[in-house]
């Protein structure tokens, strides 16, 4: 009983912390500005510009002091009196500041959790760096995989209710509810639903979405690990989560009453593995398709009865790993059969044994990557390199270093690919795009520019990756031939977005 209570225990030691007054502190908006700087592989670092200037922030805080937005009515004249002509700008600044404030609260929860629990309990707090080694080790022993698209249309009240479990400051929750309902049209869309793919206020909406996913995964992992004991567990230990046990019991009971009258341990699968990144998750298992279908309908009931979200069974696809390729984190991953020949000789008899083994293979999806290059004006939609407009005051070395940086980041991120042919094509596009950009700057032809610069210019794009990786792995990667044979996962978590978001 105590074990279950600790699994979903909420940190109540800081429940009297008040987050609402932080909205009146200028340094909060400075933090939002600093965190908002875009670290992108295919584009320059872009900040908020003048949107978060100290004058605008001070003016906003002054108006918030003069008239509390929590007591606003739905009258447009009162809203316009507060925001004036900068309604869109002020709403964006407040949303970014609110995201920073609530993230501070979640960071305190994490620190408190790590202080009270031993480090071994935090094995579920894994970064994306552990995903590919996990797939490499585990997927070769699994048989079936479910590619799940997590519902991203969430009602506003569900978001506020989810945050209520973690944030005990009523003023902040009232502000959040008011802010979402009153300024939803300004923020994203007339519909009262949040979507993961919103372009404006990404920090604010990604926080709301991730908090909702965190709640979903906590319930999912609890029911997954403790399902065999749910029937004998008292509902009193879940008092902190409103109607939690009733909803879980109903979701599981509906599923089992429609199929078998059996005990819940039949539902427990020790070989079930779960991986998620953003709006996509993968559940893989070694067992039969029957159990995978049971998990499928269980997830549907979980979303419908616990989160009140319409979730169609068609959003969960069950496939055999040997016949299916996963598009995940900028890679196209699959299981391929790799044959190995073993020769054994005893006296004069020579035996040759050919073994076929499953091997995790990851390839670079060239079409989506060319689409990203096209959006960044390095190539057209067909993959033909084009010149990129640059500032007239930029030097040749700055332009070359920028292209080299992009090539290096792409090579590092896709260093775990088993086939480098697509990566070579991308580097070829960037190399010629750099040549065309420099020729355009000097107003000369490409052939003339190459004659002036010599062959050493193109060699920089080929040697850059070898030099950097040889510093990282000096012993393993001794020759260039071996460099491209081995798989090494060198992910940059700060520059990942362009490679995994092809929308």
UniProtKB/Swiss-Prot annotation:
One GO term describing the cellular component: chloroplast
InterPro entries associated with the record: Domain_X, Maturase_MatK, Maturase_MatK_N
Keywords, ordered alphabetically: Chloroplast, mRNA processing, Plastid, RNA-binding, tRNA processing
Taxonomic superkingdom: Eukaryota
Biological process annotations from GO: mRNA processing; RNA splicing; tRNA processing
Cell location: Plastid, Chloroplast
Primary residence: plastid
Single GO term (MF): RNA binding
Similarity section: Belongs to the intron maturase 2 family. MatK subfamily.
Task of the protein: Usually encoded in the trnK tRNA gene intron. Probably assists in splicing its own and other chloroplast group II introns.
Protein name (record): Maturase K
């Amino acid at each position: 009983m105590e074990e279950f209570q600790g699994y979903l225990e909420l940190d109540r030691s800081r429940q009297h912390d008040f987050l609402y007054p932080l909205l009146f502190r200028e340094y909060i908006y400075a933090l939002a500005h600093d965190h908002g700087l875009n670290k992108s592989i295919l584009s320059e670092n872009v900040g908020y510009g003048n949107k978060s200037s100290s004058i605008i922030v001070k003016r906003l805080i002054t108006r918030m002091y003069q008239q509390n937005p929590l007591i606003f009515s739905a009258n447009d004249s009162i809203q316009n009196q507060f925001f004036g002509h900068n309604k869109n700008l002020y709403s964006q600044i407040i949303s970014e500041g609110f995201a920073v404030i609530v993230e501070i609260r979640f960071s305190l929860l994490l620190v408190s959790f790590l202080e009270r629990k031993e480090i071994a309990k935090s094995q579920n707090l894994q970064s994306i760096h552990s995903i590919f080694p996990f797939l490499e080790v585990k997927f070769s022993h699994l048989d079936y995989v479910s590619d799940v698209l997590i519902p991203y249309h969430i009602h506003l009240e569900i978001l506020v209710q989810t945050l209520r479990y973690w944030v005990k400051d009523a003023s902040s929750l009232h502000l959040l509810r008011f802010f979402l309902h009153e300024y939803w049209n300004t923020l994203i869309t007339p519909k009262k639903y949040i979507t993961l793919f919103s372009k404006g206020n990404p920090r604010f909406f990604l926080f709301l979405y991730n908090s909702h996913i965190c709640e979903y995964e906590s319930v999912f992992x609890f029911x997954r690990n403790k399902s065999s004991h749910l029937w004998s567990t008292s509902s009193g230990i879940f008092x902190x989560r409103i109607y939690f046990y009733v909803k879980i019991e109903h979701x599981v009971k509906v599923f089992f009453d429609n199929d078998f009258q059996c005990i819940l341990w039949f539902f427990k699968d020790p070989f079930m593995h779960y991986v998620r990144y953003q709006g996509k998750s993968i559940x893989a298992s070694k067992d039969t398709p029957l159990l995978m279908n049971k998990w499928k309908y269980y997830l549907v009931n979980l979303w419908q009865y616990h989160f009140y979200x319409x979730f169609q069974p068609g959003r969960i696809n069950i496939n055999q790993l040997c016949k299916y390729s996963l598009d995940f984190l900028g890679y196209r991953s699959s299981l391929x059969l790799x044959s190995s020949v073993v020769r054994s000789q005893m006296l004069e008899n020579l035996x040759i044994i050919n073994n076929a083994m499953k091997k995790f293979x990851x390839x670079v999806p060239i079409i989506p990557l060319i689409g990203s290059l096209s959006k960044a004006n390095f190539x057209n939609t067909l993959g033909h390199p084009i010149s990129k407009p640059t500032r007239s005051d930029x030097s040749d070395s700055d332009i070359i270093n920028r292209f080299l940086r992009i090539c290096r980041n792409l090579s590092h991120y896709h260093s775990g690919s088993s086939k480098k042919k697509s990566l070579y094509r991308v580097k070829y596009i960037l190399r010629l795009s750099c040549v065309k950009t420099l020729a355009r700057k000097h107003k000369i032809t490409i052939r003339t520019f190459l004659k002036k610069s010599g062959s050493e210019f193109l060699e920089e794009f080929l040697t850059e990756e070898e030099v950097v990786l040889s510093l990282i792995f000096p012993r393993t990667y001794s020759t260039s031939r071996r460099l491209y044979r081995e798989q090494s996962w060198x992910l940059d978590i700060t520059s990942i977005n362009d490679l995994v978001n092809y929308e």
